[in-house]
């Protein structure tokens, strides 16, 4: 009987496409793993249980267990169980990187309201500061018109008055910008944001309620189908598909709501950014225009020449000294004059000469920019200038170069010190010169005595 079955399978015209059954040592039929069909797995034990000889029930059960163990060990059986073919291609909340919740929307509204209050307060303060600046400028103008004020002082006071008028005008402009861009327009943006938020929430609640009701009806329908004694697999599958579709619609609704909330917050922030950028540009341009007034030729050159450096780190006092006393500043120069006596050449070598300024249009420095500035120093400088003028401009220097350290150029650079080697060499030269002078004086004295004799 096994031979006949084998011959019948081999003799069939479509034997290559059918399940191949082989005889295994005369004990049982074996299924080739290459031709295993997972959807026919429940029929393989029935086919393999056919035996040509009569056998006991115990041997049939053992053969059935051997066949199942063989199928479980095969690679084809490990791939028999597949995942569900029902897949959802809709967007979910997990796809979003950022979720804008109700709390985030509330924080956005509070931040916008805080910006509105602060911008209004800053605009009011700028307006008040502008008015005070205009009053200061008017006061300076009145002082310049006094009879006892000379022309030079009046001109400088009027320059300062014009500067404060300019500051007042620019502060008034900034106050207007803050009031318009971050005041009225920001109120409109806040109102629009709140309105769009309420519309989106109401729409989401209505659609979510509708989808939830449809989902409950579908669940009830599936429960009724499950109670039937005779189940139709096709209708049961269709009901499950409908339930999955309802769930997908509800998930898509949530995804769209959070996505719209994120876009609303982003658009509102971009609107605020454009307004802040405009205000920032206006502030930068106004500051640059004010800074140009301090450049050379800006109209404040003569006024700044009389000003002290308020940001100097070398001096803390009002007169460019540590304690604010003008007398202490000249101690170094007085000590130099005492050690040098009346020798002008020694003082010039010790103090050095400053480099002449070739540019007449550069920004003048304030008085506080120099290291020290004392009346004694100015007096010694004037004495040195007198010696230079009497010398007739030696070493190829003209009068402009000689007057660099005069009173008219009090803002020039401080004198530089020579090195120790140069000072030592100078002392040697001076000592040789003094010895020669003493020797010549002794010779003259001896000649006088001889003439008297």
Curated annotation (Swiss-Prot):
Gene Ontology molecular functions: identical protein binding; phospholipid binding
Gene Ontology BP annotations: vacuole fusion, non-autophagic
Residue ranges with Low complexity bias: 353-371
Segments of skewed composition (Basic and acidic residues): 431-442
Swiss-Prot/TrEMBL keywords: Coiled coil, Membrane, Phosphoprotein, Vacuole
Gene Ontology cellular component list: fungal-type vacuole membrane; membrane raft
Stretches assigned to coiled coil: 102-122, 230-257
Membrane-topology descriptor: Peripheral membrane protein
Record localization: Vacuole membrane
Residue ranges of the region described as Disordered: 1-20, 316-340, 353-453
Family annotation (InterPro entries): AH/BAR_dom_sf, IVY1
Role noted for this protein: May be required for vacuolar fusion. Overexpression leads to fragmentation of vacuoles, missorting of the vacuolar enzyme carboxypeptidase Y (CPY) to the exterior of the cell and accumulation of multivesicular bodies inside the cell.
Record's subunit section: Homomultimer. Interacts with YPT7 and VPS33.
UniProt-recorded name of the protein: Protein IVY1
Species annotation: Saccharomyces cerevisiae (strain ATCC 204508 / S288c) (Baker's yeast)
Lineage of source species: Eukaryota, Fungi, Dikarya, Ascomycota, Saccharomycotina
């Amino acid at each position: 009987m096994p031979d006949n079955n084998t011959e019948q399978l081999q003799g069939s015209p479509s034997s290559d496409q059918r399940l191949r059954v082989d005889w295994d040592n005369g004990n049982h039929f074996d299924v080739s793993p290459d031709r295993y069909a997972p959807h026919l797995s429940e029929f393989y034990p029935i086919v393999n249980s056919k035996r040509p000889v009569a056998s006991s029930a115990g041997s049939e059960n053992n053969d059935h267990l051997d066949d199942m163990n063989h199928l479980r060990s095969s690679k084809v059986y490990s791939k028999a169980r597949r995942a569900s073919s029902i897949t959802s291609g809709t967007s979910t909340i997990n796809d979003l990187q950022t979720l804008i919740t109700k709390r985030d929307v509330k924080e956005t509204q509070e931040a916008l309201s805080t910006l509105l209050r602060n911008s209004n307060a800053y605009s009011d303060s700028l307006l008040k500061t502008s008015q005070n600046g205009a009053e200061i400028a008017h006061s300076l103008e009145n002082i310049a018109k006094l009879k006892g004020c000379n022309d030079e002082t009046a001109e400088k006071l009027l320059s300062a008055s014009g500067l404060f008028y300019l500051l007042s005008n620019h502060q008034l402009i900034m106050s207007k910008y803050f009031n318009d861009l971050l005041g009225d327009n920001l109120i409109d943006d806040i109102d629009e944001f709140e309105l769009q938020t309420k519309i989106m929430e109401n729409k989401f609640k209505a659609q979510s309620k509708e989808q939830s009701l449809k989902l409950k009806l579908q669940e009830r329908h599936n429960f009724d189908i499950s109670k039937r004694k005779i189940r139709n697999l096709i209708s049961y599958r269709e009901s499950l598909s409908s339930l999955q579709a309802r769930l997908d619609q509800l998930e898509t609704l949530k995804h769209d709501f959070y996505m719209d909330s994120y876009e609303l917050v982003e658009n509102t922030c971009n609107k605020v950014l454009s307004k802040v950028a405009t205000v920032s540009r206006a502030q930068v341009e106004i500051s640059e225009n004010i800074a140009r007034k301090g450049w050379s030729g800006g109209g404040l050159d003569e006024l700044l020449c009389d000003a002290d450096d308020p940001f100097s780190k070398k001096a803390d006092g009002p007169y460019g000294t540590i304690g604010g006393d003008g007398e202490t500043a000249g101690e170094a120069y007085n000590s130099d004059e005492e050690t040098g006596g009346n020798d002008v050449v020694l003082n010039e070598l010790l103090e050095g000469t400053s480099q002449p300024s070739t540019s007449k249009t550069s920004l003048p420095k304030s008085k506080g920019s120099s290291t020290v500035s004392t009346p004694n120093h100015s007096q010694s400088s004037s004495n040195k200038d007198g010696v230079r003028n009497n010398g007739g401009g030696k070493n190829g220097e003209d009068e402009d170069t000689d007057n660099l350290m005069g009173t008219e150029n009090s803002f020039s650079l401080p004198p530089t010190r020579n090195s120790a080697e140069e000072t030592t060499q100078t002392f040697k030269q001076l000592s040789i010169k003094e010895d020669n002078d003493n020797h010549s004086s002794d010779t003259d004295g001896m000649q006088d005595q001889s003439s008297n004799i």
